[in-house]
Amino acid sequence: MNEKHLAYLNLGSNIEPEINLVKAVKQLHEYGDGEIQKVSNAWESKSVGAAGPNYLNACVAFISPFVQAELKERIIHPIEAQLGRKRSANKFLPRTIDIDIVLFDDKSYNDKVWKQAFVIVPLAEIYPEYQNPLTKETLFQTATRFRQEVWMEARPEVLSQFKWEKQ
């Protein structure tokens, strides 16, 4: 298990998001076999898919020895459980924390993220040059377009304690 993998994670919360986003980043930072490389600002956006409180989302570049399934099982799901995440068939319920793998070893993990401003805008802060494999548009270009189409507000104060990890 000497090989290291770079995962870009999207963290989102709309239940006490200022608290839960910070707790999730701290737990990732404190995980012994992993290392945070970069943290974006938190970004506030409207709830997507159902009425509900606004979300805060941020992206983290995280290095670990685990492949995707192990990363979910050993790190992501335990953090979500510790922070009170309740899994449900309804993907649009409010949640304390949701952690998704967006990119893994420079490969797009889920192509639907290219349509999600709440993922692309924070991800573009920490990896602006990454190109959509289908369109060749960079994250910076996609985020710029989304910022003109969708309301989002940067909330740099939320994760300001992690400045040493930001680029």
Give the ranges of each region predicted by the language model.
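Short, surface-exposed acidic-centric catalytic microdomains
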Residues: 23-68
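Short N-terminal binding/cap micro-motifs at the start of the first secondary-structure element
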Residues: 16-19
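Flexible, gly/pro- and Lys/Arg-enriched active-site loops
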Residues: 48-54, 66, 73, 78-167
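Short amphipathic alpha-helices in soluble, non-transmembrane regions
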Residues: 21-28, 71-79
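Residue-level signal for inorganic ion chemistry
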Residues: 14, 39, 60, 100, ...
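Short beta-strand-to-loop capping motifs
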Residues: 11-13, 60-66, 103-105
